[in-house]
């Protein structure tokens, strides 16, 4: 006999999923999506025009545009880059950011500054959309290697700080984001990237993250 459950709400469904997953072999990253903070982020972003995809292809299958969709992994990568200053880790191990308990708690273990998550995601999406158009000479692999460095640098330029808190991210003025800022940061990051060999290995190294942060400090007033 098979018992079919028809949950009456998203919250009920999430509780059922969590209870079921705890009894089966499910990746920790999949379980993260049912954490209350991610449900709150999804609702908050939806009210502000972004769609936080806790379940793979959920909004894609509803016909939402790619530039409107924010995946859980992408938000984690943006926060890792902007909040923790580790674009190297965002590039090197995107799939494990959510399974690392220490890193996860640093990013999502707070009470939850929903506006900060929204602004980090919005900044990340805008940079990823404009960056390839501004730097048309770059190859796809180069864009993938340095985009989170550019996101980190742009956030620093907008805040005039080389180290950001949740409060700083919440107060980022995205109206000040310009092609000029993106190009300035991208040119600087690309110079560092090429000086270190211009490879994926370089982009995944702490040496590059450290050097880029040093260069960002020189760009700030």
What residue spans do the PLM features occupy?
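C-terminal accessory/interaction regions of large nucleic acid-associated machines
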Residues: 149-221
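Active-site beta-strand/loop microenvironment that shapes enzyme catalytic pockets
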Residues: 1
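C-terminal catalytic or substrate-handling cores of phosphate/nucleotide-
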Residues: 6-163
